[in-house]
């Protein structure tokens, strides 16, 4: 499996594109990035306001047979993403609104939507 980055000018949602790539059997692991989203969404189907100039991306990969429970990813993912952001913003303190929002100086900088998808009897996590 080779990790691939898929770049788009505009998509409905980066998660939607990742789901399509998985279900169409085109890719099992990768990252979808876009400059804009026309129908971004948050948890519980809430509308996500997608302002041009922000970063929109989804990472997807297959889960092994003995993967942790889905809700454990909700705890791990914000910490991993926070650590990645800190590589670029070393002097900023990131705070959390569990389970899926990250803030710097009280301003929301990131919302995390994770979805579990099954295709051809395999489970995939999209973040």
Where is each model-derived feature located?
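Surface-exposed, flexible loop/turn segments at secondary-structure boundaries
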Residues: 13, 102, 120
């Amino acid at each position: 499996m080779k990790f691939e980055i898929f770049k788009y000018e505009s998509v409905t949602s980066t998660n939607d594109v990742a789901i399509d790539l998985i279900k169409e059997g085109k890719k099992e692991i990768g990252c979808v990035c876009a400059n804009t989203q026309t129908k971004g969404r948050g948890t519980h189907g809430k509308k996500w306001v997608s302002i041009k100039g922000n970063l929109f991306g989804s990472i997807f990969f297959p889960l092994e047979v003995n993967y942790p429970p889905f809700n454990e990813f909700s705890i791990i993912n914000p910490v991993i993403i926070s650590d990645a952001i800190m590589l670029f913003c070393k002097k900023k303190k990131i705070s959390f609104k569990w389970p899926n929002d990250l803030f710097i100086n009280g301003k929301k900088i990131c919302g995390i939507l994770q979805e579990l998808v099954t295709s051809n009897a395999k489970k995939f996590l999209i973040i």
